[in-house]
Amino acid sequence: MAQENLLIELGTEELPPKSLRQLAESFASNVEAELNKAELSFDSVRWLASPRRLALVIANLSDSQADKIVEKRGPAVNVAFDAEGQATKAAQGWARSNGITVEQAERLITDKGEWLLFKSEVKGLSVAELIPEIAANALAKLPISKPMRWGSSSTQFIRPVHTVTMLFGSRLIQGELLGVASDRIIRGHRFLGEAELIIDHADQYETLLDDSGKVIVDYERRKAIIRDQVEALAAHENGVADIDESLLEEVTSLVEWPVTLVGSFEDKFLDVPSEALIYTMKDNQKYFPVLDKDGKLLPRFIFVSNIVSRDPAQVISGNEKVIRPRLADAEFFFETDKKKTLASRLESLSSVLFQQKLGTLKEKSERIANVAEDIALQIKADTKHAQRAGLLSKTDLMTDMVMEFPDVQGIMGMHYALHDGEEQEVAIALNEQYLPRFAGDKLPTSLVACAVSLADKLDTLVGIFGIGQAPKGAADPFALRRAAIGLLRIITNKNLDLDLVELVEIAKLQYGHKLTNDNVVQDVVDFLFARFRATYQANGYSVELIQSVLVRRPTKPVDFEKRLQAVAKFQTLPEAAPIAAANKRISNILAKVKGEINAQVDPSLLQEPAEIKLSEILGSLESTLRPLFDNLDYESALFELASLNEPVDEFFDNVMVMAEDPAIKANRLAILNRLRNLFLQIADVSVL
């Protein structure tokens, strides 16, 4: 069976840059699934993409499906023929439907009987017959939220499609995709390359676009070129480029032939907090800021052009003219905002709703202040600073700078607070209240900042759950999942001795009678436990391990973490599996008991040496374990409990638990209950 590389390319108008990678990856994934479904053999599916095209190269694709022998079983022989050996209507009808006579049918003999059988050879379809439908199906499944129509066609896609190329080796596959017929024409760069290129063979694709089209169609190669060029230019300016991965991805999706250039701006703008300048460079202009070796902003920026200009200085000047008004705006906002203190802006928060049923941002700030003060007291942070930071936490939202550049909220609060003469710890908390912003982000550095960040997240969680608007499915408009995970990360990583139920109760208290959900405390705590499960599972812990701890519902995250780590290490012991099995057996026995089980073991009722031995060991262990439990030293406790493996085995081998004498039976159940409760003080190892 012959093999060739297959090229599929859609030439489009400019695709949304923030969606380009996802579209290309989804296209490749969908085509791969369709090829497997069609049972076509291939080595790999590689995606390529630029602003004006989506493309795939399928390596070593077979030219057709394999031929198949299809077997169709008919009626059983004893049903197919009557007593005289004549074919019945059932047999005749089956044969007719398969285009044969009964006499032409073969026989299938198994240990269960004998049946009529028809075998036919089905020729595999060719790539030319299959690929148009495969590609169409793959395109139909792309994640496109807002498709558009163009021209007079009813066809919809994310952007208008102008060319389609499906090339199997040198052979053009005829067909249409999105209303456009397959052709050998591909388009070069809009300004630098040839408008139309004729491609003769799939293997020419990248080279042809590189040489004649001035398009680097390999996304990852283009991205690497941009990174290298930006870093080299920054080094030439005695600096380091501030390269965000998300910005690099977006810029890669905006250009087909990257040319990096460096521009500059006046030193006076460096008096403005660098975060505001960096924000406008990155977010508004898609520029890469340049920092010195100490991380301070230099009056330079690097941008990526999509053309090779005969006069680069003109291009640089044009970009400098574009950025200068943005920087001037930031300078103006900064100077204007400093004329009013953050404290003086608190009252203006009364005009901004946090949520219709939950009141204004001023009310939210007051709640945050109260909760932050309470948390600070518990974690031995400065309560006055925590209360003050909580009260001022949202005031920078009313500044011109934050209204213009929303992403600098918090950081501008810090700068304005320092200008106002607020305590440094208060100012830092205003910046760090939003941490962590995303998975893997840094955490607040001070205890005051931790208190404010926790208070803010608790207020949002309790408020939204309290009015019955918990997240449903993927929808999470208030980012409650992120808030919950951030809350748990702060408490766990900072080793804060805080109880979730107590925290939620404190936050609930601040709302007075605003909340309508009577079960809000339980609902929020359950939501937090669910985030425990998801977070630890993502970190590689097994579902069983996490569940063993969740059964105990330890409401202190630090306690939860210590239990989880202890059980994880316990699982590595050779005694772990038999002890888990024994706990499961004990759990099943105790679950069937009707009525209460004695809390104490009566030594006078012990008869068998194995039960005497186990009871004595349990008594000794209880004394040993008590200080370990008090110190949350669950790891040492489980190592001690591992010593029960042998005496428990002896007990089950030599002792009849369900004895005929009710008193002896009850006493033996009490031994098992006592043993089970020792383990349950840490986790339910029976689920391991």
UniProtKB/Swiss-Prot annotation:
It catalyses: tRNA(Gly) + glycine + ATP = glycyl-tRNA(Gly) + AMP + diphosphate. Its EC number is 6.1.1.14. InterPro entries: DALR_anticod-bd (IPR008909), Gly-tRNA-synth_bsu (IPR015944), Gly-tRNA-synth_heterodimer (IPR006194). Keywords: Aminoacyl-tRNA synthetase, ATP-binding, Cytoplasm, Ligase, Nucleotide-binding, Protein biosynthesis. Gene3D superfamilies: Isoleucyl-tRNA Synthetase, Domain 1 (1.10.730.10). It is found in: Cytoplasm. GO terms for biological process: arginyl-tRNA aminoacylation; glycyl-tRNA aminoacylation. Tetramer of two alpha and two beta subunits. This is Glycine--tRNA ligase beta subunit. It comes from Psychromonas ingrahamii (strain DSM 17664 / CCUG 51855 / 37).
